[in-house]
Structures are given as structure tokens and as C-alpha cells.
Amino acid sequence: MKLSNEYAWIIPLCPLIASCCTGSLSFFFPRVARGFHRLCALLNVFSLAISMFVSLAIFQEQFVKNPIQQYLWIWIPRSTFCVEIGFLVDSLTLVMSLLVTTVGVLVMIYSDSYMCYDRGYTRFYAYLSLFTASMLGLVLSPNLIQLYVFWELVGMCSYLLVGFWFARSSAANACQKAFVTNRIGDFGLLLGILGIYWTTGSFEISELCDRFAKLKEIGFSNPILTNIIAFLLLAGPVAKSAQFPLHVWLPDAMEGPTPISALIHAATMVAAGIFFIARIYGLISTLPLVMQASSWLGGATALLGATLALAQRDLKKGLAYSTMSQLGYMVLALGIGAYQSALFHLVTHAYSKALLFLGAGSVIHSIEKVVGYSPNRSQNMFFMGGLRKYMPITGTTFLLGTLSLSGIPPLACFWSKDEIIHESWLSSLPLGILASGTAGLTAFYMFRIYLLTFEGDFCTIKTDWVDFNHFAPLSISMWGETEGNLSLNQINQNVASVRLGITKNKGFSSSYLANPNGITNVHYDQSLPKPKESSSAMTFSLVMLAIPTTLVGLLGINLIGETANFELSPEWLINPVHFFELSKSFNIYIKILLNSRSSLILSFFGIFFSFIIYKKSYKYFYITKKLVGFTKLVSKFGLLVQSWSLNRGYIDYYYDICFVRNLRSLSKSLSDFDRYGIDGFVNVIGALNFFGGEFIRYGENGRISYYLFIIIFGAILSSVLIFIFLPFP
């Protein structure tokens, strides 16, 4: 109790101080910051490590006790309206704070090597610490106003980090797209918060759920209005957690540095929407219409993300669509009332996907010295293959993450995903089909990513090359001037780029599925440099993340109920001795696995088909004449899937037609009206005043004869006008 009351405020404060110090040093004294950049990184890692240890200490003390809510000061003191700043410590807060700090520390250690030659090294750490402080402030917020402030800060940090390499037009466009898309959801969230206050008279999370339920019981609240308010509240999580139809920003957000993709767009920020739904779950659980809509929205998003990931060439975008799909699983679980399963999957997925993204960053970091620094090549899986023998640690840890996300026991995501599938079948047959089908697709595309990246032969030395003088690499600002020039000179001495065009073969060959980019002319060049294993800092983070990816799923095994169920307060979580006693019950584990056989069969089918198609990458997969008709059908289906996936389901295309182009036309029309209408009218008035003044100015010439002439002329003209227009009696 003492730790929670006195030291909980330290958790977000430490990274905030580190961010302010690093950012100020980088802005005001850039040369000093470049000279002491490693000390800046150490400061940020140390500050977040303090937050992690404080979170762990409070976790051990407070996890099984009642929630604590404490306010530090009053922000807006009014008699009728008062907003206070404080913190709320409960089991949900503690789990999220541990998740953010543990993943954040490992990402910072990883980034020290990944970003070491970048000129924005200290700026990167300042942004990273600011994000972790904002995220920790969000999960500790006791009221909706404080939560919304940190919600917007998290979005701002995402904007800064996605556009970190803002000199690249693709990164600049991606951060703007993410910002605008999230503004749509955040505006709905703000309206929902105001509607909650208008309905309940409170912003306090601990009060509004009870007040909302009481108002509904006595019939005081309007059912239509309450549903509208709840849907507005869900608009924020829909955008932040990349749910359909506001999911379009997430794949483009991969333009940021890969450590950011691991922390923000896989483990923490995109999970903020799930956290918010869980935080107000007592409110939305009383509204059946909202719950049903959430479940179907989550199911549709899960299936859509899985289908969009099936044929991606970009390694990071494939993982991004996978993240979108798994977030849909969580929203589906919350919509059907599987609250604990959703939170369990949030934790297991966060560690697994952070491991996968950092593994992808390790691959990209190594291979771009071979193929160049353009993301179109260094992130293209068809330039990879066979990397496991060059990068054994990265390959092994990536395989663990792949198996976990595919739902293979005893790894983490198996337990949570299986429970969600089980609850989906109990809730609704269509939702059960959606969840199960998505599980099979997940296993397929995850092993497709693994096989194309790590198995087979290194494809870069087996492709048709052209001279670098005709196709120079695109260097990005990830590397400093010296290292970048050295690396480019090294690559320029090699032969250069891969031909990505899809060749049209006259005869059918199913090798198109195994060799999707259509490269048929193979040239072996053994003189090219080979990828190497990443530095110890990067592999250390991978190994440390592999531990929770393997073991954290065991937290959710309810051995009494013999089902996978996320208990937020298991006794052995505080006393590890209990865990080793319970782990001896192998019969119960076997029963759980037998109950999960349907989802396991789907996962193994997905893995099996992935092996059939992609195991022999860049080798022809010959077939007998008897199967030609079937394989032609499969080929046509494969082309449809590829077109659907590479064109992002055509959703961005129709958004561009229906919204972007119309908004641009409207904005151009309004701009022309403002320029030629409003500004034109003002400019004409100004011009008339100017020329009128000039005309009058020439009348002041100082000649008495001229003045006398004007007076006489005016008198005569006035007399004539009076004589003409005024009748005389």
C-alpha cells in the first residue's frame, strides 16, 4: 500500500524527465548532444529501467489488493466542475505498465545499435522517452480528461516517430496519413467523453460506470442516446487500434524506424485502444447493441488483416497487417464478453509481435548493406531467403515468434488465441467460423514470412542483376555521412539491383506461387557480401523477448477450470514456488491440448500449405499433367489473392476516389473562392481607396486660381443639377 501511494507517480515521471533533458540538449546544444550521444541513450534506458522496477515492486505489492486511486493536485478548480490530476492503480494498470516498461527498455537497448549512425540519434531517444511517458500516463489516468490528454500525446509521438525520416516523402506522407486518420477517431472520442459527462456528471472512471448503470436501471437515460455515446467512445479505439475502416494508416506507419514499429505499432500504442475499451468495459457491457457491433467489427478486421497479409512482399507491412488482424481478435473477444481472454491476448501478442518486429529490423539492418538502403529492396522478402545460416540467433528467435503467433503450444499466443476461438464458437457460429478461419490464415502467412526470409537459399545472389550505374540505390538518413558513403561505395563495387517485374509466361507453371515475383533468369554471383548476424545489443533484446514469448502464456492457464483463462491475480504470480508445483500436473496440460485440437488442426493446415508453396523458394515446383487443371485454378485464385493483398483490398483506392479527391476538389474551390472572391473584394476596395486618394491628392497643388476654378465649376454644376432635377413652382 505504501509503494502504491507514494511512488506510483515516478513511473511516468522518469522517462518524461529523460525526454526533456535529451530533447533540450539536442535542440540547444546539437554538437554536445552528438558528442555525448551514448550518454543520452544511457540516461533514457536508465530512467525507463527505474520505472520498470517501480512498476514491478508495486505489482508485487498491490496486484492482489483493491484498486488505489489518488489525486496529486487540482487542475481546474471550480465549484460545479473540477478536474484533478492523479493516478489509478489496479490490476489492469499494473499489467499495462509492466508491458510498456519491459518492452520499452529492450527496444531502447536495441535502438542503440540500430540507430547508432543516424544523425537524429538523440532526437530519436527524446521522442521514444516522451512516448513511453505518455503511454504510462495514459494507463495510470483515473479520469477521462487526463486519459484524453495522454491519448493525444501518444498520437503526437506516433506522428513524430513515423515521420522521423521526414526527408523521405513517403515517411512525411505516412505520418500525415496516420495523424489525419487518428484525428477522425479522436474527435469521436472527445464527443463521447463530453456526452458521458452530460449524462453522468462525472469524468471519473471509477464512478461513471456505476452511475451509467444506475441511470439505465431507473430508466432515466435515453437508450438511443446512450448507444450513440458508446459508439462515439469506441471511435477512438477503432482508429488507434487500426480497426476497419480506420485501419489504413497502420501499414504506411512502417515508414518509421523498425524499433518504433516494434514498440508503438505492435506492442503498446495500438493496444491503447484495447486498453481503453477494457477500462470502460463496465459501461459498454450494459449495451448489447454496442457489444454485438464490437464483436462483428473485430471479427471483420481480423479476417481482413489476415487476407491482406497473405501476399505482401514488404516484411514490415506483412507484420503490420498481422498486428491489425490480432487486434481484431481482441476487439472480437471484448465484444462477446471474453474480457480476460482479450487482455491475455493483448499481453501475449505484444511480446510476440515485438520480437518479430525487432527480428525484422535485425534482418533489414543486415541485408541493406548488400542490396542497398532503399526500403523497396531491403524490406522485400524476395531479396532474402536462407538468412538463418547467416543470422542464427535472429532466425531462431523469429521462428519462436512465428510459432507463437501461429498458435503452436506451449508458446504464448496459443493459450490466448485458443480461448478466444473457444468463446467465439460459444457466442455465435459465424463469429466462430471467422475466428477459426483467421487462425488458419495466420499460420499460413506467418510461416510464409519466415520461409521466404530465413529458409532456402540467399536469393540476392541468384537474381538477374543490372549495373548500379543505371539503377543507383536510394540512401536514407538512417546512416551518418561517413558510414553511409562507405557503405554505398562498397555496394557500388558490386552488381546492383533486382528486377522486380512480373514476367508473363506462355505456359502455366505453379512456380509462380513459389516464386511470386516472377524471376526466371537466375544469375549466381558469389562475390556479393553476405549478411551477418546483428550486434550483441540487438541480439540481446531478441533473446530477452523470446523468454516471455515462450513462457508468458502459462500465466493464463487456469488449472482448476482446465481452460486457458487469464486470471489477473493468480497466487503463483506472486510466489513462483506455486508455479513449479502446478507445472507438475501434466494430465491437465494434455486435456487442454485435446480441447484445443480443432484450432491446432487449422494452424497445422496453414503451416502445411505454406511449406508446400514457399519451402522451395526460387525453384520450380513441377507437377504432373493430371494436376494441370487443378493447379490452373489454384493459380488464378493465387493471382486474385495477390492482387487483393498488394492493392490493400482496394480500400485505399476507393477512399482516394470517394474522399481524398472530393476533399481536394472542395478545398481547391474554397481556396479559389477565398482568393478571388473574399480577398478579391477586399483588394478592390483597397484599390479604389488608393486611386481615390491619389486623385484627391493632385487637387492639393497650392494654386488659388485652381481652387477658384473648382469652386465656380462646382457651383455651376450644382445649379444645373438643381434646375434639372428639382421642379420650380
UniProtKB/Swiss-Prot annotation:
Coiled coil: none
EC number: 7.1.1.-
GO BP of this protein: ATP synthesis coupled electron transport; electron transport coupled proton transport
TM ranges: 9-29, 39-59, 87-107, 125-145, 147-167, 184-204, 218-238, 258-278, 289-311, 327-347, 354-374, 395-415, 425-445, 540-560, 592-612, 627-646, 676-696, 708-728
Main localization (coarse): plastid
GO CC annotation terms, alphabetical: chloroplast thylakoid membrane
Keywords noted in UniProt: Chloroplast, Membrane, NAD, NADP, Plastid, Plastoquinone, Quinone, Thylakoid, Translocase, Transmembrane, Transmembrane helix, Transport
Membrane topology, record value: Multi-pass membrane protein
Cysteines engaged in disulfide bonds, as pairs: none
Top-level division of the source organism's lineage: Eukaryota
Similarity field: Belongs to the complex I subunit 5 family.
Designated name of the protein: NAD(P)H-quinone oxidoreductase subunit 5, chloroplastic
Source species: Adiantum capillus-veneris
Gene that produces this protein: ndhF
